[in-house]
């Protein structure tokens, strides 16, 4: 049995306006950060389907990256990726990049 892509999965329930979550950014408490290795990505969009915070940036069914303002670092995206295209890295590795 092969996995279906996001376009082949029947529509279930969709919350298109998830409360007031967009009003509240994650802040500085995220411990792990997802990193996309685009060369491995097959744009199956499982990450987009499973992300509880709508932090996956996609355009026309193509994975573009992450909205780190809302990503909690839970790792669901990395866990569901069939090609291991998403790696979870410690947030401390990025402190010098952000000042």
Swiss-Prot record:
Residues the entry annotates as binding [4Fe-4S] cluster 2: 51, 71, 74, 77
Keywords carried by this UniProt record: 4Fe-4S, Electron transport, Iron, Iron-sulfur, Metal-binding, Repeat, Transport
Annotated binding of [4Fe-4S] cluster 1, by residue: 41, 44, 47, 81
One annotated GO molecular function: oxidoreductase activity, acting on the aldehyde or oxo group of donors, iron-sulfur protein as acceptor
Record's cofactor remark: Binds 2 [4Fe-4S] clusters.
Gene3D superfamilies recorded: 3.30.70.20
Lineage top rank: taxon: Bacteria
Cofactor(s) this protein cannot do without: [4Fe-4S] cluster
Domain (4Fe-4S ferredoxin-type) ranges: 32-60, 61-91
Assembly: Heterotetramer of one alpha, one beta, one delta and one gamma chain.
Name of this chain's protein: Pyruvate synthase subunit PorD
């Amino acid at each position: 049995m092969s996995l279906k892509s996001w376009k082949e999965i029947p529509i279930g329930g969709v919350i298109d306006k998830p409360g007031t979550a967009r009003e509240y950014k994650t802040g500085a408490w995220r411990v792990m950060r997802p990193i996309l290795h685009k060369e491995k990505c097959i744009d199956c969009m499982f990450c987009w389907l499973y992300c509880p915070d709508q932090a996956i940036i996609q355009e026309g069914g193509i994975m573009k990256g992450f909205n780190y303002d809302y990503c909690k670092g839970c790792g669901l995206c990395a866990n569901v990726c069939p090609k291991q295209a998403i790696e979870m890295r410690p947030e401390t590795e990025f402190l010098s990049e952000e000042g």
